[in-house]
């Protein structure tokens, strides 16, 4: 087992990893930017090293500085969290070259699964159902239009290297195709330095269902059930829950088996997520694989009793999975709401600033993952998510009631958040019915 782990991240996920290290008796090393000198993760870690200025390029995205900090602190492994360098194949490779363990899959797997077209082809070869679409890269709108007409409108235009909802546009007809293609491609170039696009059939009003998997270095892979992430705004998840109201035991088992097959086809190790679209006829299609821990991993932890961060550490240290598929039982229901420092009334504009007063909820079955405190100033340089409120109940309605109560207890002064917006989602009759799709926000809130 590792003696010392460096956490190449910030915010609530850095705090989450530090806590797991502490429970395992592993020394934790935080890295931080000048904007984060008072951040909670720097205070909780055993050691903290400043790696640069506030801009992510000068700190949390600066591979050389992070690796220098790891070498200087004699850390044996780096946990990348999510975002930043977590799905950067070059960084994983650099860790390997420096004889530091990257807590995640290999650089080659990150590269292959990060390229959406290669990931699709890998799944097609493994007989995993995929959304009908192009098999080759598309670089021009003219060529893309020809392929779109063959597939049939509406289509989804996607960046091959995309993620987080960037580089994606829906085209409903040949008339709007060129404009949407060019916008998506520009986003891809700006966000990922890659102009490679691909086109697939747009599945209307699907559910977004993802399966959590764990895989060790010895070919053992298990599924930890699904998360329903259908409540999204512009492809950004807002509310996540497990299990999904849409799946019965038979479909859950079938999708879980396909998720395991997909992970094996990718030669995957560590915690990972296979994302599917589920259409109105209960047909499911592979969408992408996330080669990192997810923001929404706590809902899976609540219904399985596993600690996914610890499992990642065990796997990276070369240990065999201590669980078999028959050991995994989904009990009860968990829901997560993301609390963001943003103003829904002003097109969700980020609202950084000082927290003058903070009270977060508690009680039986309520978990808070956050890095904020009274007096803390949220810097303007990073993602607007400041906390995750997670609840657990014996069934979905109990969990909804608990979330309604928890959100009602939150008191945060000094900054604007999406708290009321999340409350409105949770109490909406359509959400309560469980009959939700990825169009929920668009249909009822915009």
Annotate each predicted stretch with a short phrase:
Residues 146-156:
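Acidic/histidine-enriched active-site and ligand-binding environments that engage anionic O-linkages
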Residues 159:
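N-terminal nucleotide-binding beta1-loop-alpha1 segment
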Residues 110-113, 123, 156, 168, ...:
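Methionine-biased hydrophobic packing positions in alpha-helices, especially
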Residues 7-16, 20-23, 48, 71-73, ...:
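ATP-dependent carboxylate activation and anion-phosphoryl transfer catalytic cores
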Residues 47-49, 111, 129-137, 168-169, ...:
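Structural signal for short hydrophobic segments within the conserved structured cores
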Residues 1-125, 138-146:
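ATP-binding N-terminal substructure of ATP-dependent carboxylate-amine bond-forming enzymes
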Residues 122-131, 152-154:
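A polyampholytic, Gly/Pro-enriched intrinsically disordered region
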Residues 29, 79, 101-103, 131, ...:
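Structural detector of well-ordered beta-strand residues that form the stable sheet scaffold
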């Amino acid at each position: 087992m590792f003696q010392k782990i460096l956490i190449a991240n910030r915010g609530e996920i850095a705090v989450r990893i530090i806590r797991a290290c502490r429970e395992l008796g592993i020394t934790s090393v935080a890295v931080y930017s000048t904007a984060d000198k008072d951040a909670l993760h720097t205070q909780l870690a055993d050691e903290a090293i400043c790696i640069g200025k506030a801009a992510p390029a000068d700190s949390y995205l600066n591979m050389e500085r992070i690796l220098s900090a790891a070498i200087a602190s004699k850390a044996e492994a780096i946990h990348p969290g999510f975002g930043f360098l977590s799905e950067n194949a070059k960084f994983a490779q650099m860790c390997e070259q420096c004889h530091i363990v990257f807590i995640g899959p290999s650089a080659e797997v990150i590269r292959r699964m990060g390229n959406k077209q290669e990931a699709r082809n890998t799944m097609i070869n493994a007989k995993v159902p995929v959304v009908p679409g192009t098999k080759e890269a598309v670089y021009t709108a003219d060529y893309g239009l020809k392929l779109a007409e063959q597939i049939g409108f509406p289509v989804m235009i996607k960046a091959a290297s995309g993620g987080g909802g960037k580089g994606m546009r829906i085209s409903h007809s040949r008339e709007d195709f060129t404009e949407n293609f060019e916008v998506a491609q520009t986003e891809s170039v700006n966000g990922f330095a890659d102009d490679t696009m691909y086109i697939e059939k747009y599945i209307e009003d699907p559910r977004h269902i993802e399966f959590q998997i764990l895989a060790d270095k010895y070919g053992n892979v298990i599924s930890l059930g699904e998360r329903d992430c259908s409540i999204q705004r512009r492809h950004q998840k807002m509310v996540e829950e497990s299990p999904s109201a849409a799946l019965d035991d038979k479909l859950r088992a079938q999708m879980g088996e396909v998720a395991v097959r997909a992970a094996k086809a990718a030669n995957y190790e560590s915690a990972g997520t296979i994302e599917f679209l589920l259409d109105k006829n209960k047909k499911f299609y592979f969408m992408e694989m996330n080669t990192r821990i997810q923001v929404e991993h706590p809902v899976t932890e609540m219904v399985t009793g596993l600690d996914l961060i610890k499992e990642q550490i065990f796997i990276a240290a070369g240990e065999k999975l201590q669980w078999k598929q028959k050991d995994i039982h989904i009990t009860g229901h968990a829901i997560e709401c993301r609390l963001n420092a943003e103003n829904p009334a002003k097109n969700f504009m980020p609202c950084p600033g000082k927290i003058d007063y903070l009270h977060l909820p508690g009680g039986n079955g309520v978990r808070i993952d956050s890095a904020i405190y009274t007096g803390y100033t949220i810097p303007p340089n990073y993602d607007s998510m400041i906390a995750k409120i997670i609840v657990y109940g014996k069934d979905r309605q109990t969990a909804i009631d608990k979330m309604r109560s928890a959100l009602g207890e939150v008191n945060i002064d000094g900054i604007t958040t999406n708290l009321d917006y999340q409350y409105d989602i949770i109490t909406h009759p359509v959400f309560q019915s469980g009959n939700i799709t990825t169009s929920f926000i668009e249909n009822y809130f915009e």
